[in-house]
């Protein structure tokens, strides 16, 4: 689980407006933070299949949000990808 202070920083860094918590950019950034936090856990606990299912669900949800953002506004999509460092 992400600490609320880290979550607030992520929201502030990616928000489009003052109280924006629901835009695709914020949602993708929060999912990315959670995924990055869980990744080391699976390097040490390779057999945690139940947890891996949750991780894959988060990755899938992030992918769907990114696909939506790419279809709606490609400029925002490319800016977000560059900011989060998701694509090589």
UniProtKB/Swiss-Prot annotation:
Extract the GO molecular function terms from the UniProt entry. rRNA binding; structural constituent of ribosome
Provide the function of this protein.
Answer: One of the primary rRNA binding proteins, it binds directly to 16S rRNA where it helps nucleate assembly of the platform of the 30S subunit by binding and bridging several RNA helices of the 16S rRNA. Forms an intersubunit bridge (bridge B4) with the 23S rRNA of the 50S subunit in the ribosome.
Q: Which UniProt keywords apply?
A: Ribonucleoprotein, Ribosomal protein, RNA-binding, rRNA-binding
PROSITE patterns per the record?
RIBOSOMAL_S15
Protein name listed in UniProt: Small ribosomal subunit protein uS15
> Which family is this sequence assigned to?
Belongs to the universal ribosomal protein uS15 family.
Biological process, per Gene Ontology? translation
Q: Which gene encodes it?
A: rpsO
Assembly mode:
Part of the 30S ribosomal subunit. Forms a bridge to the 50S subunit in the 70S ribosome, contacting the 23S rRNA.
Any one Gene Ontology cellular component term annotated for this protein? cytosolic small ribosomal subunit
Lineage summary: Bacteria, Pseudomonadati, Pseudomonadota, Betaproteobacteria, Burkholderiales
**InterPro entries in the record:** Ribosomal_uS15, Ribosomal_uS15_bac-type, uS15_NS1_RNA-bd_sf
> Record's Pfam families?
Ribosomal_S15
- Gene3D superfamilies xref list: 6.10.250.3130, S15/NS1, RNA-binding
Question: Can you tell me which residues the record assigns to a coiled coil?
Answer: none
- Keyword check for RNA-binding, yes or no: yes
* Record keyword Kinase present: no
- State the species of origin: Verminephrobacter eiseniae (strain EF01-2)
């Amino acid at each position: 689980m992400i600490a609320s202070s880290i979550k607030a920083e992520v929201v502030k860094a990616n928000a489009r407006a003052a109280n924006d918590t629901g835009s695709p950019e914020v949602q993708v950034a929060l999912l990315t933070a959670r995924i990055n936090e869980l990744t080391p856990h699976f390097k040490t606990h390779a057999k945690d299949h139940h947890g891996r299912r949750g991780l894959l669900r988060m990755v899938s949800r992030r992918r769907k949000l990114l696909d939506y953002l790419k279809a709606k506004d490609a400029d925002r999509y490319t800016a977000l990808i560059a900011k989060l460092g998701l694509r090589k």
